Each structure stands twice: as structure tokens, then as C-alpha cells.
């Protein structure tokens, strides 16, 4: 290596010397001569400075080559970096433009959404202002509020009237006592009643401060009481009242016989309490002592007391109701004691008050009194003065008066309108009347007592038997059926005689005033009555039973279970299956009664098929075409390609919404 390097260095030096000599022609010759001389004289020259210069040149060349290589590498890398930077810059620009576009689109979408929301709010506000349902609910609430307020005002008004009774001759039909009346006319008991009523009015005014709770059934209960009257008229429920001690008092008061000193004030509307009392006062009568002493010293047993509570009593609201025959509206007939000899009067204290007589009934307007055993009633009430009335009203107690209160609390009527029809069923049944009837201006009936009729009065004689009248009508209407007499057997006659003792008793009573008929005539009449009963009652009842059985069979019909085709369902709807009624006929005849319990769900599913077919018929198609259409809907292919039919239940489910 060193030899090669030395040779290379020598060659470079020779090249350098040659280049120098070429620069000067004269020098070339001189140099060559000198070199030759030197070479001959010095065979191995060793210059010391040449190796140092050669090493530095080599280092510079290597360094420069390395620098150049590095520069090339840097240049390539810069080029690559520039390209990458350009790519990144382009992507940033693209993303920036995309973000700007998104912002712009978002702003436009926000504006559109805001405008739509504003329109929707405006529309909702318009709907809320024009919604008929909201208006209906508002009107309903207003109506309920108005009804409640008017009801409360009316109750308050009625309560005020109960505390202050307006005693007017024009409205109530009796003379109004004035402050100038003599105390002897009123009597000590009457003034004691006024004082008691004043104290009770104060107590009731305190009780009226309780919180009122509206009873939703109150309107229904009061409907009978206000059926014929207007809202401005006052209901005068005036009840006949008796005192256990024998003295007659004003309605609803406990009179005292110990007070003999009259109070020095006159009767005014402000200190008179209404006759409408609580039912609790009637309950207090049940707590009477076992033996009650009457005014004449006799002792009333509990049996007589209870009998007195059950005795009938009649009330007349005012003179107007008596003039227009309000009693006749309820068919209250008194054949034995409403005649010329047995007068019905309204008695009074004193003899100077006016007396009226209308239709054989003597009416007077006065305060109450017990006059020589006659029962008197205050406030325009009917008074019965004869012995027959004593027997009816008193029974075994010989007309001893009892105190009866017949007004419900708050004036509520407990039953509905069926009471009037129930009362009409018992018309012309007088006998021993056990009616507790209160006649008001509105012709209402107090509902707490159910009318019952006893065939015999207290004298033991039949007064007016509805059955006997009905049988007498049968005699006049069935005179052409006498040929049926011989067709009945004696056994039937004897059986009827045992069951009809009451009718035989009626035929023998002196009240009928008929001569005793022969036995054959009575038998013929009885057989005629039996035939009449059979033709008019038993046969129609059998016919009704057959109709009811047919109706029950129709109502108990069950829809066909799991029908195989739509045609079967339609046939059942139109004509019926196996003689059973058709579904359409049942709907037209009974409505939904036949399917309320048993066929409710099944019919609701079948109804979709019925409606689908009927809609097609309305559009001009036939029932068969609609049935075929439904049957085609049932066809489908399974996974093997076979054609099968879906169930009727699937078909009914697919028709939901029709």
C-alpha cells in the first residue's frame, strides 16, 4: 500500500513539474538537465514536506465528498418534506372549506328549524284558543259551579223560610193573627209553643253554621218534591201532629200543660218555626215510657202508642189545594164518613173566625184545640169528627191523639218517580188506610212509608174491597159464559170455596145490602170467576212463558266455534246455521244483549269479516266475490312450496282497522 501510494504521489509530482515546464519553454530544458544531474548524483532522494501535503488533500477530498453526499441527502429529504407539507396544506384547506360549508349549512338548518318551531307554536296557540273540547270542559265546570251555587242559595233561602214562616191569607188560605188579638184567643199553651219555637229557632240557627257538604243524590231525591212547582214557590209540608198528653200542639213542638201564664207578645213571622222537622224527632217517639197518661186520666199502653204511630192522617197544604181537588188526585175515598151526616171540619179556638164550606167540607182557619173528644189540626188541616174516624185514627185507644212527624231531614225524597205509579196501583183501596201521605203544593208524596190496605175497618166490616169490585165487574162482563158452569167439577168448586172465604164473607156483609143468593148461583159465579182467571191470567202467562223461553234461547245462542271457511261465517250472519237465529237478526232484535256475556270477544273479531263483506257489497260487489277475495288471502306457500291455508283467526287479525 505504501509503495502504491508513493508511486501515485510521484506521478502527481511529475505531472506537476511537467505542467510547470510547459509553462516556460526555457525552463523545461534547464529543469530536465538539472533533474538528470541530480538523479545521477543522488540516487535515493527523500523529501520530507511532500507526504504532509498529500494527506491533507486526501482528507479534504473525502470530506468534500461526504459533504456533497450529505447535501444530496438533505436535498432529497427537503424535497420529500416539501411534498408532504404541500399535501398536508391541501388537506387543511379542504377541511377548512368543509368546516365552513358545514357551518353555513348548520346556520341555514337552524334558521329553517326556528321558523318551523315558531309556526308550530303559533298553530298550537291557535288550536288551544279554538279547541271545542277545552271550551266544553270550561262550560261544564262553569255549569257545575253555577248549579252548586244556586243549590246552596236555594238551601239557604229555604232555611231562612223555615225560621221565618210567612203567614199570609192570600198565599196560605187562613187568617193571619195580628198583634192586636186577645191573649184569651191564643191561650196559654199557644204562647208557650211560640216561646219554645223561638228557642228552637235559635238552636237551629247555631247548627246551620256547620260546613255544608253537597250531596250529589240530593237533586234526584228532591225531584219529586219540585216536579210540579216552580223555584219561587214555597213547599208547605204541613203534617198532622198529636200530643201524647192529649193536647194538640203546633207541628214539631213539645207543648207543656204546666204553663198557664201566656207570654205578652203576639205571633209574628220572626218567632214562628217551620213545620219541617228532623226525622230524629220522630225517632224520639220510640223512647216513650211504657205507660203514658192521657189528659182524662187513662193510661195508654205501648200497643196503643205504636198503633197511634201507625194511624193514618191527612194534610191539606192550603185552601187552593182543597178547592181544586188535590185529595182526589190520589184517590183517597172515604165512603163511610165523608157524607152529609159525618162532616169533616177544621175546628178552631173561639167562634169569631170565618168559616167556609166547600163541597160538603166545613173549613175554618184557626189555632189548634182539642174540642170535646174531636181531633183538631192546626194550619188548615182536615179534622174528622165522627166516631168512625175515631175508630180509624185511634183503634182501641178511642181516638187518643199521638204525635207523628213525617218530614225527612233536609226535605230529601228517598225514592224516584216510580212512587206515583206505585200509589196509582192502590187507588180505590180504602178500608183501614195505612197511608202516611203528606200533600204539598207540588203534589209530592212522602216516600218513607209504603201504602198498605186492610180489607176490614176497625168495625169488622169490609169498607171497599177492590177484589169484590173486580169480581162484580166479572159478573157483568161474563154473563155470556154461563154455559161453562156444567163443565167444571164439584171438586174444583169445593177447592175454590176454601180459597175464597173472604169473597164469601164479602157477599154476606150488610154493606153490600144485597139479598143472599142461592148456593147454585154462587157456585156458578165462582166457576165463572175461575174461568175468567184462567183465560185472562193463566193462559197469557203460559204464552208469555213460551215467548220468554224463545227469547232466552235466542239470548243464550253461542257463536259457531272454529268455522272452516268464511262462507260458513257469512251464512251464520245472514241466515243462521242448523235452524238457529241469524246474527243479523239477533242484532236487529236484541241489540247487544245477546252478546254481552258469552259472545262479546268472538263477535268483535267476526265483526271485521262482516264489515269487510258489507263494505264490498256497498261498493257494488257481491258477497261471493268478497268471500273469494278473503279465501285467497288465506292461501300461502310453505318452505316446501306447498300451497296451504291460514286460519280464520289469522284472517280476522289481518283485518284489524277495517
Swiss-Prot record:
It comes from Candida glabrata (strain ATCC 2001 / BCRC 20586 / JCM 3761 / NBRC 0622 / NRRL Y-65 / CBS 138). Residues 219-229, 522-532 have a biased composition (Basic residues). Residues 407-421, 485-504 have a biased composition (Acidic residues). Residues 33-55 have a biased composition (Low complexity). GO terms for molecular function: DNA-binding transcription factor activity, RNA polymerase II-specific; RNA polymerase II cis-regulatory region sequence-specific DNA binding. It comes from the Eukaryota. Residues 434-443, 455-467 have a biased composition (Polar residues). The gene is HOT1. GO terms for cellular component: nucleus. Residues 1-55, 218-237, 392-550 are annotated as: Disordered. Residues 22-32 have a biased composition (Gly residues). Required for a complete transcriptional response to osmotic stress. Keywords: Activator, Nucleus, Transcription, Transcription regulation. Residues 1-14, 505-521, 539-550 have a biased composition (Basic and acidic residues). The keyword Ribonucleoprotein does not apply. Signal peptide: none annotated. Belongs to the HOT1 family. One of its GO terms (biological process) is positive regulation of ribosomal protein gene transcription by RNA polymerase II. It is found in: Nucleus. The keyword Nucleus applies. Disulfide bonds: none annotated. This is High-osmolarity-induced transcription protein 1. InterPro entries: HOT1 (IPR052146), TF_GCR1-like (IPR022210).
Amino acid at each position: 500500500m505504501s509503495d502504491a501510494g508513493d508511486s501515485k504521489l510521484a506521478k502527481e509530482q511529475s505531472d506537476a513539474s511537467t505542467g510547470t515546464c510547459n509553462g516556460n519553454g526555457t525552463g523545461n530544458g534547464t529543469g530536465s538537465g538539472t533533474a538528470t544531474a541530480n538523479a545521477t548524483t543522488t540516487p535515493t532522494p527523500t523529501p520530507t514536506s511532500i507526504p504532509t501535503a498529500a494527506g491533507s488533500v486526501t482528507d479534504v477530498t473525502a470530506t468534500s465528498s461526504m459533504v456533497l453526499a450529505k447535501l444530496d441527502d438533505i436535498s432529497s429529504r427537503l424535497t420529500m418534506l416539501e411534498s408532504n407539507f404541500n399535501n398536508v396544506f391541501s388537506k387543511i384547506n379542504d377541511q377548512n372549506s368543509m368546516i365552513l360549508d358545514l357551518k353555513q349549512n348548520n346556520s341555514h338548518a337552524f334558521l329553517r328549524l326556528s321558523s318551523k318551531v315558531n309556526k308550530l307554536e303559533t298553530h298550537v296557540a291557535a288550536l288551544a284558543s279554538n279547541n271545542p273540547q277545552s271550551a266544553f270542559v270550561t262550560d261544564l265546570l262553569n255549569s257545575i259551579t253555577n248549579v252548586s251555587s244556586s243549590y246552596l242559595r236555594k238551601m239557604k233561602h229555604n232555611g231562612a223560610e223555615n225560621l221565618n214562616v210567612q203567614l199570609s191569607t192570600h198565599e196560605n188560605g187562613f187568617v193571619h193573627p195580628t198583634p192586636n188579638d186577645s191573649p184569651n184567643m191564643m191561650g196559654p199553651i199557644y204562647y208557650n209553643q211560640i216561646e219554645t219555637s223561638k228557642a228552637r229557632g235559635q238552636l237551629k240557627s247555631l247548627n246551620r253554621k256547620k260546613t255544608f257538604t253537597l250531596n250529589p243524590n240530593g237533586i234526584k231525591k228532591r225531584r219529586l218534591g219540585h216536579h210540579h212547582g216552580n223555584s219561587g214557590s214555597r213547599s208547605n209540608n204541613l203534617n198532622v201532629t198529636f200530643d201524647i198528653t192529649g193536647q194538640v200542639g203546633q207541628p214539631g213542638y213539645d207543648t207543656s200543660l204546666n204553663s198557664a201564664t201566656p207570654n205578652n207578645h203576639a205571633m209574628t213571622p220572626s218567632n214562628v218555626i217551620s213545620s219541617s222537622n228532623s226525622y230524629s224527632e220522630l225517632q224520639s217517639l220510640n223512647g216513650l215510657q211504657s205507660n203514658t197518661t192521657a189528659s182524662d186520666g187513662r193510661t195508654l199502653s205501648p200497643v196503643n202508642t205504636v198503633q197511634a204511630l201507625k194511624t193514618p192522617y191527612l194534610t191539606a197544604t192550603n185552601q187552593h189545594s182543597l178547592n181544586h181537588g188535590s185529595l182526589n188526585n190520589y184517590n183517597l175515598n172515604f165512603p163511610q164518613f165523608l157524607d152529609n151526616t159525618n162532616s169533616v171540619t177544621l175546628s178552631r179556638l173561639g167562634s169569631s173566625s170565618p168559616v167556609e164550606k166547600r163541597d160538603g167540607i166545613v173549613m175554618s182557619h184557626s189555632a189548634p184545640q182539642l174540642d170535646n173528644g174531636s181531633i183538631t189540626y192546626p194550619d188548615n188541616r182536615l179534622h174528622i169528627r165522627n166516631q168512625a174516624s175515631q175508630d180509624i185514627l185511634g183503634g182501641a185507644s178511642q181516638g187518643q191523639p199521638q204525635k207523628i212527624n213525617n218530614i225527612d231531614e233536609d226535605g230529601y225524597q228517598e225514592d224516584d218517580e216510580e212512587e206515583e205509579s206505585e200509589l196509582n196501583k192502590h187507588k180505590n183501596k180504602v178500608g183501614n188506610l195505612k197511608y202516611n201521605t203528606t200533600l204539598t203544593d207540588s203534589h209530592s208524596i212522602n216516600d218513607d212509608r209504603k201504602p198498605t190496605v186492610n180489607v176490614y175497618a176497625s168495625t169488622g166490616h169490609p169498607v171497599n174491597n177492590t177484589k169484590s169490585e173486580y169480581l162484580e165487574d166479572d159478573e157483568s162482563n161474563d154473563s155470556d159464559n154461563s154455559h161453562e158452569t156444567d163443565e167444571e167439577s164439584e171438586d174444583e168448586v169445593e177447592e175454590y170455596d176454601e180459597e175464597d172465604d173472604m169473597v164469601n164473607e164479602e157477599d154476606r156483609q150488610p154493606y153490600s145490602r144485597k139479598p143472599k143468593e142461592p148456593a147454585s148461583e154462587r157456585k156458578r159465579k165462582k166457576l165463572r170467576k175461575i174461568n175468567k182467571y184462567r183465560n185472562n191470567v193463566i193462559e197469557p202467562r203460559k204464552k208469555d212463558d213460551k215467548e220468554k223461553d224463545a227469547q232466552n234461547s235466542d239470548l243464550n245462542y253461542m257463536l259457531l266455534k272454529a268455522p272452516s271457511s268464511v262462507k260458513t261465517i257469512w251464512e251464520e250472519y245472514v241466515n243462521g246455521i242448523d235452524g238457529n237465529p241469524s246474527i243479523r237478526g239477533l242484532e236487529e232484535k236484541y241489540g247487544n244483549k245477546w252478546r254481552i256475556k258469552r259472545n262479546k270477544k268472538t263477535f268483535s273479531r267476526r265483526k271485521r269479516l262482516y264489515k269487510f263483506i258489507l263494505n264490498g257489497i256497498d261498493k257494488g260487489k257481491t258477497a261471493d266475490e268478497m268471500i273469494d277475495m278473503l279465501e285467497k288471502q288465506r292461501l300461502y306457500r310453505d318452505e316446501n312450496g306447498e300451497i296451504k291455508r291460514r286460519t280464520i283467526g289469522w284472517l280476522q287479525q289481518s283485518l284489524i282497522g277495517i
